[in-house]
Amino acid sequence: MESLNALLQGMGLMHLGAGQAIMLLVSLLLLWLAIAKKFEPLLLLPIGFGGLLSNIPEAGMALTALESLLAHHDAGQLAVIAAKLNCAPDVHAIKEALALALPSVQGQMENLAVDMGYTPGVLALFYKVAIGSGVAPLVIFMGVGAMTDFGPLLANPRTLLLGAAAQFGIFATVLGALTLNYFGLISFTLPQAAAIGIIGGADGPTAIYLSGKLAPELLGAIAVAAYSYMALVPLIQPPIMKALTSETERKIRMVQLRTVSKREKILFPVVLLMLVALLLPDAAPLLGMFCFGNLMRESGVVERLSDTVQNGLINIVTIFLGLSVGAKLVADKFLQPQTLGILLLGVIAFGIGTAAGVLMAKLLNLCSKNKINPLIGSAGVSAVPMAARVSNKVGLESDPQNFLLMHAMGPNVAGVIGSAIAAGVMLKYVLAM
């Protein structure tokens, strides 16, 4: 009987909590959205599966060595950790002390847990290498750069303003998060508000990179919100676009884009990086990888490297990035009031970014002979190329012969640049406070 009881107690099912059960259902929902609805499947599928692995009771796949020690509840070991932190020897007090401790002290406690025989789970290791170091989002950005054509942007430089205007959603969302905190509705610190705001850029890698730096505790919710809303762009944007434009404006036919020379395409990423990085060094990592990837594409002399970055490398990193995000979908971190606030602010951010891009296009039309179809302003959010396709689709509904796709790619690419710069601004000024 004792052996049978020990066997039963060793089953994960016996230790399944309500929070873990809910998160298992959330993870299954993400898998269903990825497989059945094809909502950003390249990221939501590994994120969902990572969420499943993270919430299997007793497996500890997403726990660091220190978290495994705390979950083990050994009184002697807790006393050693508590003595180092000068707090009461119980799990809750230790967690509070760790939250207030310096990163160097947290690292010392992690090493102490390793010395006591605990090891981090595989997903925790993935997270440390892929996101904790910031490497995975940067490599993804390199791949995106290698797949990006700056031609439409260079052919119509005014569209850069549309991409810039769409970033207004980012900063409006930061203010929204701080407003919720001010009125005591949902508690958000300034770094957390900045990390949430980047959802408005509709740029998954940038959202993961920034939240990993500013608010790693919210990374799971921010990543899920960012990629879910990116997949919902065809549903979120059209009503806003139609509400802000007239039938006549939607029928505007734009002048055919000029041919951009190879020299321009080669010089642009180099000049862009130098201008932005010299003014805002904190944007250099993201923008640097993006421009490097694009230079490999446009130079034409490293086709093997360009092909590897666009295909094999970005696919491999995407797998580990998704599983690493899934490591943050543990119940005690995800099932918080903050998650609801993130989901609400995320959709508002998308809406504001879309509206700002459309309104900027209308403003430019007031002082220009060559009219811009305001619909392409919505492509200023950097969901590439989905936002551009939505602009084209809504335009075709008003005029079946008015193809806006290539025109919309200009602000779409500008949005990627804008979100990277916005992330640099957040890092520079938020971390300095």
UniProtKB/Swiss-Prot annotation:
State how it assembles: Heterotrimer of an alpha, a beta and a gamma subunit.
Entry's localization field: Cell membrane
Which GO MF term does the entry hold, naming one? decarboxylation-driven active transmembrane transporter activity
Topology relative to the lipid bilayer, per the entry, is: Multi-pass membrane protein
As its record notes, the protein acts as a catalyst of: oxaloacetate + 2 Na(+)(in) + H(+) = pyruvate + 2 Na(+)(out) + CO2
What protein am I looking at? Oxaloacetate decarboxylase beta chain 1
The record's family statement is: Belongs to the GcdB/MmdB/OadB family.
GO terms in the biological process aspect are:
sodium ion transport
Please give the function described in this protein's UniProt entry: Catalyzes the decarboxylation of oxaloacetate coupled to Na(+) translocation.
Taken from the UniProt entry, a GO cellular component term is:
plasma membrane
| UniProt KW Nucleus keyword | no
Q: Which gene encodes it?
A: oadB1
Going by the UniProt record, its keywords in alphabetical order are: Cell membrane, Ion transport, Membrane, Sodium, Sodium transport, Translocase, Transmembrane, Transmembrane helix, Transport
- List required co-factors: Na(+)
The regions listed as transmembrane in this protein's record are 16-36, 42-62, 122-142, 160-180, 216-236, 266-286, 311-331, 340-360, 413-433
Which Pfam families has this protein been placed in?
A: OAD_beta
> Where is this protein chiefly located?
membrane
> What EC number(s) is this enzyme filed under?
7.2.4.2
